[in-house]
C-alpha cells in the first residue's frame, strides 16, 4: 500500500495558483509525521513532493519503511514551492546539512511572489530554530521535552498546533491530523479543509 499516495475565511493563496509542498526527510524520519500530512494534503489535490536530504532518493524511515523520494536536495529548486515541511525525526542530521540551511534561507528571505510557508512537527521546529528561520517574536510548538523547550526559549508555546505568521507547527503525533487540516485552511480556506476532512470521514471544525 502506498501511504504517501472560521467560516468564509479568505484564502491566502489564489485558487489559480497551485499549492506545492516540499516534505524534507532523511534516514530515520518518523513514519507518521511524514506520511499522514502527505496523504491528507494530496487528498486536497496539493502537489506534494518528498525531498531526500541525502545523496540518494531512497530513504528508510524510523520504523523501517523504505520510501522513494521524488527528488534529492541537490536537485531541488525550492522556488517552485509554496511551503517546506520538516517532520519529526532525525533532525540532528538535517542541522548538519549546510545546503539545506542555505536553501531554506533563500526560500524564506528572498521570496518572489506570495508568502513562503514553513511547517514543522515534533522536533522539526528545532531545525527552524537552528537555521535562524524563526523571528524573535514568533512562537512555535514542539514536543514538551526539556531540551527542545530550552532550545526554543522565548519562541516556545505549549499548544498542540500553532500558527504564527508564516510558520505552522505541530507538537506531536496526536496533533498531526489537526495540523494537516490547519495547513489546508490557512493556505486555501476553511471550505477546502472541511471538504478534505469529509473525504477521510473526519470532521474538521477549524
From Swiss-Prot:
Name of one Pfam family that matches: DJ-1_PfpI
Domain of life: Bacteria
CDD domains from the UniProt entry: GATase1_DJ-1 (cd03135)
InterPro entries: Class_I_gatase-like, DJ-1/PfpI
Name of the protein this chain belongs to: Uncharacterized protein MPN_294
Species, as recorded: Mycoplasma pneumoniae (strain ATCC 29342 / M129 / Subtype 1) (Mycoplasmoides pneumoniae)
Amino acid at each position: 500500500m502506498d501511504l504517501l499516495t472560521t467560516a468564509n475565511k479568505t484564502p491566502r493563496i489564489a485558487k489559480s495558483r497551485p499549492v506545492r509542498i516540499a516534505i524534507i526527510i532523511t534516514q530515520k524520519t518518523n513514519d507518521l509525521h511524514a506520511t499522514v500530512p502527505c496523504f491528507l494534503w494530496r487528498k486536497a489535490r496539493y502537489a506534494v513532493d518528498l525531498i531526500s536530504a541525502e545523496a540518494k532518493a531512497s530513504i528508510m524511515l524510523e520504523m523501517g519503511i523504505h520510501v522513494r523520494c521524488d527528488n534529492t536536495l541537490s536537485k531541488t529548486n525550492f522556488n517552485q514551492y509554496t511551503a517546506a515541511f520538516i517532520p519529526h525525526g532525525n533532525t540532528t542530521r538535517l542541522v548538519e546539512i549546510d545546503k539545506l540551511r542555505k536553501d531554506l534561507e533563500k526560500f524564506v528571505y528572498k521570496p518572489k511572489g506570495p508568502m513562503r510557508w514553513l511547517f514543522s512537527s515534533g522536533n522539526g521546529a528545532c531545525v527552524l530554530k537552528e537555521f535562524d528561520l524563526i523571528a524573535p517574536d514568533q512562537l512555535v510548538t514542539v514536543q514538551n521535552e526539556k531540551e527542545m523547550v530550552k532550545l526554543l526559549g522565548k519562541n516556545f508555546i505549549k499548544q498542540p498546533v500553532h500558527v504564527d505568521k508564516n510558520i505552522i507547527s505541530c507538537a506531536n503525533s496526536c496533533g498531526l491530523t489537526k495540523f494537516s487540516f490547519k495547513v489546508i485552511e490557512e493556505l486555501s480556506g476553511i471550505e477546502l479543509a472541511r471538504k478534505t476532512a469529509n473525504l477521510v470521514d473526519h470532521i474538521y471544525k477549524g
